[in-house]
Amino acid sequence: MGRFFNSKVNAFQDVLNSKIYIDKTGLLEYTNSVIDTTSKFICNSRPRRFGKSITADMLTAYYSRSLDTEEIFEKLEVGKTADFRKHLNQYDVIHIDIQWCIEPAGGADQVITFINKNVIEELRETYEKELSEGTSSLPDALSQISAKTGKKFILILDEWDVLIRDEACLLYTSPSPRDRSVSR
């Protein structure tokens, strides 16, 4: 268990410990209803400071098999739903905050390589027998594991837009080639 794959860190508990918390666990009723459908790929694109990271932490705490969070969720809105235990702590979860990958990766252009390498290393700790020796692609690794075990993974990408945001910021804050030639 590591930083990305089935982390034992329950960041959602910190959210619940805060003085201000608005229960959005009702969203889990929806995500549970689409898990085994073609609608299972969900993109939560909202403005900054809209609670996306808290939602990502909630999804991780709810679905991850590395955590035991029944006591937490049974007291919240999702706990009132008929089948809230059906998917609770039943999945291998890979939770990646892209923003925190840029620096250790050595820059935005190395993030995918960094994620592939590190997540596959973590997967090997649990699924060594299921992975071919030279596996270097995360989609390939997940496909191999799923084919051999039948297990499903939940992949949560937080701050996925940081690469776009940062590139746009650089584009609009860097001097244009014309401006650079004038300043010489």
Where do the PLM segments sit?
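Single conserved hydrophobic/aromatic residue that forms the stacking wall/gate
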Residues: 172-184
